[in-house]
Amino acid sequence: MKRIFSYNSFRMILSLSLILGSIGIASAASSTALPDPNRIRYKPLSFEPPRAERLRLENGMVLYILPDKELPLVKIKVVVRTGSMYDPAGREGVAELTATMMGTGGIAGMSGNAVDETLESIAAAFHASVNRDSGILSFSVLKKDLDRGFDLFSRILTQPSFEEMKLTLAKDLKMEELRRIVDDPQKLAFREFGRLIHEGSPRGRVTTSASIRSIQR
């Protein structure tokens, strides 16, 4: 009985100590007045956004060049006026599949796997994506490998081969994603909201399994 009483007493004392300590901390915190934000003084902030050089090529393409010598890395981003809203009726999803295939489908004279291996060998990275009204193709490579990397990047942009096997895989993955959309209520709600709000407009069209199956090389 003495042992039980001692244990219970210890638990009670410990609990009271914790409660009193918490009250003390809360009281101390509440007694510390916060400074008036209107009376806070600080040095004026100085910021000058970097200025990019703007060039227009003979073909009408506009370039923005911004040197940054902090790292020996060259980053290139190409923005194209395209997107899912320009997909032909009945072939919704073609813009997204095109972006996927740009990164995996290979180029003339080189398979997709060979392109991946070459990019990895020079620590370069390529990524393509599209939204409703634009497409973005990004590339980064070390300065010492710029010539080799830029040659490969330009071939990806101008000579994609869209391997049949990689296209079939991309279509299967997209159709599986569409099948599983009912498992994500938020994603499903956004899709249906876009369909309703833009009803009758190209922006209101949605990708379906049937439209994906209709896409061929």
PLM feature spans:
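Bacterial N-terminal signal peptides that target proteins for export
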Residues: 2-14
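Proteolytic maturation boundary segments
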Residues: 4, 25-65, 73
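Bacterial N-terminal signal peptides
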Residues: 11-24
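Scaffold signal of the M16-like zinc-metallopeptidase fold and its non-catalytic homologs
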Residues: 29-37, 106, 149, 181-217
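Soluble periplasmic/extracytoplasmic beta-strand elements of cell-envelope proteins
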Residues: 54-56, 62-66, 75-79, 118, ...
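M16/MPP (pitrilysin/insulinase) zinc-metallopeptidase core fold and M16-derived inactive scaffolds
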Residues: 77-140, 205-207
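M16/insulysin-pitrilysin zinc metalloprotease superfamily fold
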Residues: 104-110, 140-173
